[in-house]
Amino acid sequence: MTQTLSQLENSGAFIERHIGPDAAQQQEMLNAVGAQSLNALTGQIVPKDIQLATPPQVGAPATEYAALAELKAIASRNKRFTSYIGMGYTAVQLPPVILRNMLENPGWYTAYTPYQPEVSQGRLEALLNFQQVTLDLTGLDMASASLLDEATAAAEAMAMAKRVSKLKNANRFFVASDVHPQTLDVVRTRAETFGFEVIVDDAQKVLDHQDVFGVLLQQVGTTGEIHDYTALISELKSRKIVVSVAADIMALVLLTAPGKQGADIVFGSAQRFGVPMGYGGPHAAFFAAKDEYKRSMPGRIIGVSKDAAGNTALRMAMQTREQHIRREKANSNICTSQVLLANIASLYAVYHGPIGLKRIANRIHRLTDILAAGLQQKGLKLRHAHYFDTLCVEVADKAGVLARAEAAEINLRSDILNAVGITLDETTTRENVMQLFSVLLGDNHGLDIDTLDKDVAHDSRSIQPAMLRDDEILTHPVFNRYHSETEMMRYMHSLERKDLALNQAMIPLGSCTMKLNAAAEMIPITWPEFAELHPFCPPEQAEGYQQMIAQLADWLVKLTGYDAVCMQPNSGAQGEYAGLLAIRHYHESRNEGHRDICLIPASAHGTNPASAHMAGMQVVVVACDKNGNIDLADLRAKAEQAGDNLSCIMVTYPSTHGVYEETIREVCEVVHQFGGQVYLDGANMNAQVGITSPGFIGADVSHLNLHKTFCIPHGGGGPGMGPIGVKAHLAPFVPGHSVVQIEGMLTRQGAVSAAPFGSASILPISWMYIRMMGAEGLKKASQVAILNANYIASRLQDAFPVLYTGRDGRVAHECILDIRPLKEETGISELDIAKRLIDYGFHAPTMSFPVAGTLMVEPTESESKVELDRFIDAMLAIRAEIDQVKAGVWPLEDNPLVNAPHIQSELVAEWAHPYSREVAVFPAGVADKYWPTVKRLDDVYGDRNLFCSCVPISEYQ
């Protein structure tokens, strides 16, 4: 039969590109699990009362090329003015070698958080470099591997200051009046739930205030003034007050390290080390503290350890501080950080080295000096005598100056009384400075750059002598070796080769949704129209962003069944926090602020109780029954016991146990009956889209992991996005912003992120995914994710029992394999299986979550039957190896599992094992062999011998 033109146009072509199994493979798998069709399978699994009768109306699919053209037209509505607004955001020059070999390289951006260090040594080394940059520039002893943004880091610094403070009765946190306004906004939001009083005043008046446990100072103030706080910090320390300092990473190249001045905590944004502004993000924050406070620090910390052969190896250290272990007692709810962006910043430092960074910083400062000298020569007054890159210029005709700036397509900072702010950066040129002279002085200013340069070169007093750095930075060889592009390219490739990412194999991590991050989805993030906008530019310059964000929000509203979506949260954990704050403020608006009990099932992700604690709630755990479902009797009892103090329940759906609970609507009804709200964690949204929705189920608020369900890549541990969907009654209580009015959001609440739309520049990824899939493709993606999980479960259940199943013995989009009986019988653990999978070329499934002694597998819809079978065959082969141990063929203390993973050097070393080299390193054959570079990590050694900075190059050889 002749095809129609519509069929030939094939607007749904991308659906087949995104979904791994083709129609024939899908039918084979359906036959294997005993289902006639995808609809029949989901009809068996998903409770009838929550199945959508009609699909969400998000439109028909578009081809990759049509979607890119459509988004390009939207992006073209953004106006790319030259921005001198500053406030913590500047234009950058991202070295092309890093752009091409990291940011645009799936070997870097599709990797997961390095919980399995043996397959993560490359990005762990890059993160260790980031920590070394932080240590050198801040002058402190311990650094983390990034936080979500500078403002979040400030809030974490406040919380940490309280944890370590010896002034246990003090409850006030002092913030210097010249911190960035968005920083103050986020600090105030966090302080409210902790019950802290925030005092804002001139830094020199801090000693006038009593009962202060911590102080936040900014080394280079928001309007540009460099502060020498040495004496003040000394006085504060004598009073046992914890001192945090916000610092500019580029200024720190030239300025005295705050740690050397006595600061306890130093943080800031690493954005200007090569990361585009992107209308607010994503950007990595750096965070450092004194060694004595290391166990109270938030976020991931990379440490140096040893592997089983005694070789140097890297790992995430001190994980007992974190939410996935300590739950509500964790230092922070942080799960996702900003690994990809931290690694861009670290490689920027590697590529430029100390000499290059000093040249960049000195050039920025020289141009600022030239601008200042010219303006002063013509009679304009600078508000501050000491500055690095930012001038606060007093102007009589401010309106006229701003009008001339707009005509020249220039953005100046305009919110300063009787003055304008001008922040220069590494992209600023001589021509830009001359243009600024014209804007501020008129065209006939008569100034000459070279003449001014000679003047300031011999007589620059804009940085106080005491504030000039007198120590060397970045002396480690890694920062002094890779300065040619050839060397840099090879170094980055050597790191990439050490890691296992989606460009090599499936990553079957349960609760993580490691699906395809399609090239077409990634292309727009580097378009200048999206990458180069300042988050605080006038809204009329960001009409393309506003249109794209509004469309994406509308689609998410339809897909979730909610009434509004807030795009601000920078991660899933931050979305949880924002959603719980909305619930808290809603109760307060009804004079029910006493409602502070949050019910959380025993199976919940660790971020849930940690976020509830951060939102000022008490956590009460609800039991699960023998089938892994919420125990309704216990829920009713706990809700009744909480009574008028019940705030909410946090529940994941499908459950963290990998099943669609039949009673989910009843759970919602019980909580609502007692006046509580239902927070439905969106971590497993990939099994809902197009089939059901949180709003239809009965929830009030959810966060959406755009880095899971909606295809933003995990980046090796960030970036992520966690927007929240809410019912209408909660919409007035979502985060707002003190600098930018968020259109369509009538909220009066404080911010949770530095930028109004969080990591706005990665939102085009999710826009592209939804646009190319359409309603039809999105539903099919969910259905195939469910099919793939059930196929794996059905083929593996005889070898590894599936712990929890729902109706008809089915699972949702993931399954939990119970290793405990095998461990009791043979001594082989889930850890041994996880490490042995590396020899077979796979990243391990999620270990011991949500149940200790298990492996949780989530294949996603993007993996083909060929890849699923390869994984299944590997698991079955491992089961056969376990049987060899059980039969006594291999001793428990010396077999391929307990010695896994095996590395290349073992092939030429002496061999005393009872199994062959071939069994050790080529269990799945030689084709596409992945070689780990280290053997199994010694976690105990790493935590007992904590070392979190760069080691000699010889240690890696």
From Swiss-Prot:
This protein's record includes keyword Oxidoreductase: yes
Oxidoreductase found in the keyword field: yes
GO molecular function: glycine binding; glycine dehydrogenase (decarboxylating) activity; pyridoxal phosphate binding
The EC number(s) this enzyme carries: 1.4.4.2
Top-level EC class: oxidoreductase
Keywords annotated in UniProt: Oxidoreductase, Pyridoxal phosphate
One Gene Ontology CC term in the entry: glycine cleavage complex
Cofactor: pyridoxal 5'-phosphate
Entry-linked SUPFAM superfamilies: PLP-dependent transferases (SSF53383)
One GO biological process term: glycine decarboxylation via glycine cleavage system
Reaction(s) the record says it catalyses: N(6)-[(R)-lipoyl]-L-lysyl-[glycine-cleavage complex H protein] + glycine + H(+) = N(6)-[(R)-S(8)-aminomethyldihydrolipoyl]-L-lysyl-[glycine-cleavage complex H protein] + CO2
Record InterPro entries: GcvP, GDC-P_C, GDC-P_N, GDC_P, PyrdxlP-dep_Trfase, PyrdxlP-dep_Trfase_major, PyrdxlP-dep_Trfase_small
Record-linked Pfam families: GcvP2_C, GDC-P
Post-translational modification N6-(pyridoxal phosphate)lysine, affected residues: 708
Function: The glycine cleavage system catalyzes the degradation of glycine. The P protein binds the alpha-amino group of glycine through its pyridoxal phosphate cofactor; CO(2) is released and the remaining methylamine moiety is then transferred to the lipoamide cofactor of the H protein.
Subunit text: The glycine cleavage system is composed of four proteins: P, T, L and H.
Family named by the database record: Belongs to the GcvP family.
HAMAP family in alphabetical order: GcvP
Protein name per UniProt: Glycine dehydrogenase (decarboxylating)
Organism: Shigella dysenteriae serotype 1 (strain Sd197)
